[in-house]
UniProtKB/Swiss-Prot annotation:
Family named by the database record: Belongs to the MobA family.
Enzyme nomenclature, EC number: 2.7.7.77
MF annotations from Gene Ontology: GTP binding; metal ion binding; molybdenum cofactor guanylyltransferase activity
Function: Transfers a GMP moiety from GTP to Mo-molybdopterin (Mo-MPT) cofactor (Moco or molybdenum cofactor) to form Mo-molybdopterin guanine dinucleotide (Mo-MGD) cofactor.
Highest taxon above the source species: Bacteria
Entry's free-text remark on domains: The N-terminal domain determines nucleotide recognition and specific binding, while the C-terminal domain determines the specific binding to the target protein.
Originating species: Bacillus velezensis (strain DSM 23117 / BGSC 10A6 / LMG 26770 / FZB42) (Bacillus amyloliquefaciens subsp. plantarum)
Catalytic activity: Mo-molybdopterin + GTP + H(+) = Mo-molybdopterin guanine dinucleotide + diphosphate
Listed name of the protein: Probable molybdenum cofactor guanylyltransferase
CDD domains assigned to the protein according to its UniProt record, in alphabetical order: MobA
Binding-site positions, GTP: 8-10, 20, 66, 97
One Pfam family it belongs to: NTP_transf_3
Length: 200
């Protein structure tokens, strides 16, 4: 099955104060860390129209804005846009604000999308993580239906799908991999954590 990697980088980043996708991280930017976790293959970045030029100037070739009718409708619109505008059977999704996610974790999730499953969703500390997940192309019509009804919660969408829920600890994924960097305080703590780890 052909896999397409999807980086969700279309959030408003209001609490962060600047586009999170371009936050500095390990000699690069947050979104580039997501690309490393994919480990290669076709990658599409879903972003806001005003940020596309910056991605292109950083030599990214496949950058899309949400479908016009669903613009500004959150990650559901981003995943739908990727499915509609690219040729793939499975879609591995990473939100750009989770820079600690590893390739090992994403491979483990990808391997579990088999048979008639629509999605593989990790669960960490009793919280579903639908923005670090794998989806089959067949869910596109469900996403469209949810968007047209303005039902934008990912958890509501998952109720309509055949989902394999995977406990993070069962695939050796640490809770830090699912931590969202939403504010500058989160970012400062992240940098301090990494600096401390490097000194150990």
């Amino acid at each position: 099955m052909k896999r397409v990697n999807v980086i969700l980088a279309g959030g408003a980043s209001r609490r962060f104060g600047e586009p999170k996708a371009f936050a500095k991280w390990k000699g690069g930017m947050f979104y580039e860390q997501a690309k490393k976790a994919f480990g290669g293959g076709e990658t599409v970045i879903i972003s806001r129209p005003e940020h596309i030029k910056k991605f292109l100037s950083n030599r990214e070739r496949h950058v899309l804005a949400d479908e016009p009718r669903f613009r500004g409708m959150g990650p559901l619109a981003g995943i739908y846009t990727a499915m509609k505008q690219t040729e793939g059977e499975t879609f591995t999704v990473i939100s750009c604000d989770t820079p600690l996610v590893t390739r090992k974790t994403m491979v483990a999730l990808e391997m579990k999308l088999t048979g008639n499953l629509d999605a593989v969703i990790p669960v960490c500390k009793n919280r579903e993580q639908p923005l670090l997940a794998v989806y089959h192309k067949r869910v596109q019509d469900v996403l469209f239906d949810q968007l047209t009804q303005n039902k934008l919660k990912m958890t509501d969408t998952l109720k309509r799908l055949s989902v394999c829920y995977v406990q993070a600890e069962d695939i050796g994924a640490g809770p830090e991999e699912f931590a969202n960097i939403n504010t500058q305080d989160d970012y400062t703590r992240l940098l301090a954590h990494v600096e401390s780890s490097n000194q150990d």
